[in-house]
Amino acid sequence: MATYIMGDLHGCFTEFQQLLDKISYNPNYDELWLTGDIVARGEHSLACLRFIKDPKNNIKTVLGNHDLHLLATLVGIKKVKPTDKLEALFSAPDRLELQHWLRKQPLMVQHPTHNFLLVHAGISPEWDLSTTLSCAREAEMILQSDNYADYLAEMYDNTPDQWQDNLTGIARWRYILNAFTRMRFCYADKRLDFSCKLPIEKAPVTLKPWLELDNPLYDTHDILFGHWASLMGKTSRSNIYALDTGCVWGNHLTIINWETKQIFRQERLK
């Protein structure tokens, strides 16, 4: 049995299947975990969702920002962008089934055997493990509740940018979502920044990648994340793995065998 973790799919279903063939993935013995952003920008988001949802494929995922945005469009909060290439999903007969399955997926996972932490964008530099786990479960309960659409309507904001234990309501929920699904850079005082999308070497000196800030959790646990394609799999910490390598942008899809730490890649098919 092998445990695999794969970076952001963004609707790249053909490359997804090619990579599974390359590693001889067997769902009867192996398990596959995904960093989220299953959908948007690529041509085959619907096929990706259906394949991942099918229990016989033994695949689990965390939610990414594009997955959350899809939920917001499905409930009518946002309009579909043509660049997201989601038209087939909106006319699919199983649209509602996929919608309700998606909103029941976790924001963060601690693997039951290997103990690694899996998340889409990152873990707040202000959280210990207990806070990370409790915040994930708290936000997931809202997504799985009957009034989840009311909360989705309020997620499109960059504030608050700093964690406080006494945050409540929408502000608390929004910080949790932004940390798990949108974070890249932070200030030295651990405030989150959402304006900079430059490569690390071109970013202002006042900003640092979240994983380079001081947080004991970053030293004690293996963390796997996606979201940040411009890192191209490179981080400053040997125990923190960046798995989004920009397949949808013409680069490649990446998967790691956790037991052996072997990396496999599938180039974008033109």
From Swiss-Prot:
Which superkingdom? Bacteria
Keywords, alphabetical:
Hydrolase
Report whether Hydrolase shows up as a keyword of the record.
Answer: yes
What GO annotations for molecular function exist for this entry? bis(5'-nucleosyl)-tetraphosphatase (symmetrical) activity
Q: List, alphabetically, the InterPro entries matched.
A: ApaH, Calcineurin-like_PHP_ApaH, Metallo-depent_PP-like
CDD domains per record:
MPP_ApaH (cd07422)
Q: Which reaction does it catalyse?
A: P(1),P(4)-bis(5'-adenosyl) tetraphosphate + H2O = 2 ADP + 2 H(+)
Assigned EC number: 3.6.1.41
Q: Does the keyword Hydrolase apply?
A: yes
Gene3D superfamilies tied to this protein: 3.60.21.10
Record-stated family = Belongs to the Ap4A hydrolase family.
Q: What does this protein do?
A: Hydrolyzes diadenosine 5',5'''-P1,P4-tetraphosphate to yield ADP.
- Entry-linked HAMAP family: ApaH (MF_00199)
Q: What is this protein called?
A: Bis(5'-nucleosyl)-tetraphosphatase, symmetrical
Instruction: Give the species this sequence originates from.
Output: Haemophilus ducreyi (strain 35000HP / ATCC 700724)
Identify the coding gene.
apaH
